[in-house]
Amino acid sequence: MIASLDELYHSELFFLPAMDKNARLVGLEIIATFATEDGAVRMPTELVAPRLSVEEQYCLFVEKLALLETCQHFFIQHKLIAWLNLPPAISGLLLLDSELFSRAARFPFLELAINENYPGLNHGKENETLAHLAMHFPLMLANFGAGEASTKAIFDGLFKRIMLDKNFIQQRADMISFEPFMHAIVAQISSSCESLMIAGIDNEAMFARAAPLGFSALQGGLWPPVPVSQLIRLVQR
C-alpha cells in the first residue's frame, strides 16, 4: 500500500511472534512499517496511522488479509493464532461490507485486536458496533493498562484474549512489587477472558520473571518481527 504523507511511503508487513512460557510459538500479529521509496526512512504504524485516510486504512487491512491468505496453511498446520489490528474506522465497514466480512471470517484462527482508545470502549456491550464485532469475531484487547479505558468491556466478556500494554509492563518491571502486581491482575481478569498475554518482554531476564506468572503468551523485543519468508524458522527447534 502507498501512503501519501509528506512524501510517498509504502507499507511493509511483518509477523510479530507471541511465545508461551517454554518459548514455543503461540501466534503471530501482522504488523506494518512504512518506508520511503528509497528505504532511507522507516516509521512504525503507530506514527503513521493517525495520518492515514479511511481509504488507506482499509487498503492496509485488506493487504494484511491478503498476506494471511498466502500463509494460512502454516497457521492451520501449526495451530497458531493470527492477530490483526482493527482500526476504529474499519470496524463499522467490516460489519457493513459483505465482501470484507467474508474475507476476514474465512480464517478460523484469526482474532481482531483493538486498542484501549477505541471509541466508546468504556460502554462495553452497550457499544453496538463492538458488541456485534464480538458476536462474529474473536476480539483481543491489545494494550490493556495503557490508561485510556475502564475495565467495563473486559468484565462484559467482549474479549477472548487480553494483552497487557508493553509500556505499562516496562514502567513496572523494575519494581519489587512487579510479580505480586501481575499475580493480582491475572487473578482479577482471567475469569473474564480465555487467556491473558503480556507484552514488553525485551530480554531473557524479563522473560525469566514473566514466564511463571500465568500468562498464556509473551511478546516483545526478545522475539523480533520476521518477514513471511522466515516464518518457518519460528517453529524449528
UniProtKB/Swiss-Prot annotation:
Q: Which keywords accompany this UniProt record? A: Repressor, Transcription, Transcription regulation, Virulence
Q: Name one GO molecular function term.
A: cyclic-guanylate-specific phosphodiesterase activity
Where does the EAL domain start and stop, copy by copy?
Answer: 1-237
Q: Which Pfam families match?
A: EAL
How does it associate, per the subunit comment?
Answer: Interacts with FlhD in the FlhC(2)FlhD(4) heterohexamer, inhibiting its ability to activate transcription.
Family statement: Belongs to the YdiV family.
Described purpose of this protein according to its UniProt entry: Acts as an anti-FlhC(2)FlhD(4) factor by binding to FlhD, decreasing its ability to bind DNA, and thus negatively regulates expression of flagellar class II operons, decreasing motility in nutrient-poor medium. Required for resistance to host phagocyte oxidase.
Q: What is this protein called?
A: Anti-FlhC(2)FlhD(4) factor YdiV
